[in-house]
Design a protein with these regions (language model features):
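Residue position within the beta-strands of beta-propeller blades
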Residues: 138-139, 183-185, 233-235, 297-298, ...
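Blade-loop segments of beta-propeller domains
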Residues: 142-143, 148-192, 210-213
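Short, conserved, GDST-rich strand-edge loop motifs in beta-rich repeat architectures
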Residues: 92, 141-148, 234-258, 349-384
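A short helix->beta-strand "capping" segment at the edge of beta-propeller domains
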Residues: 93-125, 396-402
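Beta-strand-rich domains and repeat architectures in extracellular enzymes and scaffolds
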Residues: 115-151, 408-412
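Residue-level detector of Asp-centered blade-edge/turn motifs that repeat once per structural unit
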Residues: 131-134, 176-179, 226-229, 290-292, ...
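Surface loop/turn motifs at the tips and blade-to-blade linkers of beta-strand repeat domains
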Residues: 117-122, 163-168, 209-216, 275-281, ...
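Asp-box/WD-like beta-propeller blade repeats and closely related beta-sheet repeat scaffolds
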Residues: 185-227, 234-251
Length: 435
């Protein structure tokens, strides 16, 4: 039997009327079940997201709290390290020295001619220069070795150079006495020493003569001068630690201004040591008058040169019988040298620091600078190329003869005939100027 279109449509209508409600009910139940499952899943996702957000907020809160505590701890540690941490040389308040007016002296630039420069090869950091028997001698350390661990006395005639003797430590100064013996000031991390090398044993042995004063190790020895009577004068910059060498000790004294520098005299005849003058804020240079009767001492912190009778004992800088011969200097004086005509040469390690002297009465700020470390302290002091690196003055009438420029951190000065030789920090050359 064939089913026509009408019959087929009737069958579909009867089936839909019979099964349709059940199918619709089934689909409705299935859709409701699916909607409820989706709703439960959505609620679970929302609860999970809320839980994650809460945990994240709690973690961030704990992190912020820990960061705050850590930051406060770091800040407190920094405040302690810069303000309250005990230091060996607490700063002392002082009155900043006046600034001298222009002297009108002749301006002389250090020579740029290579013929006026004494090359020292690998040697660097010239700390002292002397002339003897037509040769120029320089105290320097070998740049090929660890800095300041081993120093040599180098002799040059302008064409060649050779090491005369070597010492362990920093050779901060040397001087020849009337007998030709060599007197040295040597600084090591263990302390300073005054040493002697006899003229017939150079290169063989260096004898330590003075290593202690009143049972305490000698401090930062900075200069030595031999008198015509055989007595030997030597300076101790101050009571600072000597672990990092003379330059670091001088910077520390500039910032602390403890006034603990001393000048001593050693008499080889009876091997006695006596105090000449104390209360110096960085005794960094010595010079004797041509007749050996007057002693000049450079005072770093007070920017002056003290003058006194070489036979005087137990003086105080600025006190009775020890007055400032030249004050208000434009820089912090270091090495001194005296010519036969009484002309005194004053070298400057650094130019005057306006920040330091502005805070002369502030022990807080200078204490922070002392605690901040050596790298920061080095940035506080410098010597621009246009600033005086040395000056020449007549000790007879006090007239300023010449101002030298073009150097950097002048550590040594030595007049020889028509030239003046200069040593500069970390320089591999002995510089000079024609006069």
């Amino acid at each position: 039997m064939r089913i026509g279109l009408v019959e087929f449509l009737l069958i579909l209508a009867i089936a839909s009327l019979t099964v349709g409600p059940q199918v619709a009910l089934f689909v409705d139940r299935w859709m409701r079940r699916a909607n409820r499952a989706n709703a439960r899943a959505a609620r679970r996702r929302a609860e999970y997201a809320a839980q994650m957000a809460a945990e994240r907020d709690a973690l961030l809160k704990r992190f912020r709290t820990a960061s705050t505590v850590f930051g406060v701890g770091i800040l407190l540690a920094l405040v302690y390290a810069l303000v309250f941490r005990p230091i060996d040389t607490p700063p002392q308040a002082y009155t900043a020295p006046e600034v001298r007016q222009s002297t009108g002296a002749v301006q002389t630039a250090l020579s740029a001619d290579s013929r006026d420069v004494l090359a020292l090869g690998d040697y660097q950091g010239v700390d002292c220069i002397r002339e003897q028997d037509g040769f120029v001698y320089a105290a320097a350390y070998n740049g090929a070795t660890l800095k300041k661990r081993k120093s040599d006395l180098v002799r040059t005639d302008g064409g060649s150079f050779s090491a005369i003797l070597s010492v362990d430590g920093e050779l901060t100064g040397f001087a020849f006495d009337a007998d030709g013996d060599l007197w040295l000031t040597v600084l090591t991390p263990g302390g300073g020493a005054l040493c002697r090398a006899r003229h017939d044993s150079w290169g063989a042995a260096v004898e330590q003569v003075v290593t202690q004063i009143d049972g305490a190790p000698l401090g930062a020895v900075s200069a030595v001068e031999a008198g015509p009577d055989g007595k030997v004068y030597f300076a101790v910059a101050g009571g600072e630690a000597v672990d990092n060498g003379l330059e670091a000790a001088l910077r520390t004294e500039l910032l602390a201004h403890t006034g603990t520098g001393w000048v001593y005299v050693y008499d080889p005849a009876d091997r006695s040591v006596q105090r000449v003058v104390g209360g110096v804020a960085g005794a960094s240079g010595l010079a004797l008058s041509p007749d050996g009767r007057t002693l000049s001492v450079s005072d770093l912190g007070n920017r002056c040169v003290w003058s006194m009778d070489a036979d005087a004992r137990e003086l105080t800088a600025g006190g009775k019988n020890c007055q400032s011969a030249f004050s208000g200097l434009p820089g912090y004086p270091g090495a001194l040298a005296m010519e036969a005509d009484g002309t005194l040469y004053i070298s400057y390690r650094w130019t005057r620091s306006g920040w330091l002297e502005k805070n002369a009465d502030s022990t807080l700020l200078r204490g922070i600078a002392l605690r901040a470390g050596q790298n920061l302290q080095e940035k506080l002091f410098g010597l621009p190329s246009d600033a005086p690196c040395a000056e020449a003055v007549s000790t007879a009438d006090g007239s300023w003869k010449r101002t030298f420029t073009g150097g950097s951190s002048c550590t040594a000065v030595c007049p020889v005939g028509s030239k003046v030789y200069f040593g500069a920090a970390d320089s591999a050359q002995v510089l000079s100027a024609r006069i």
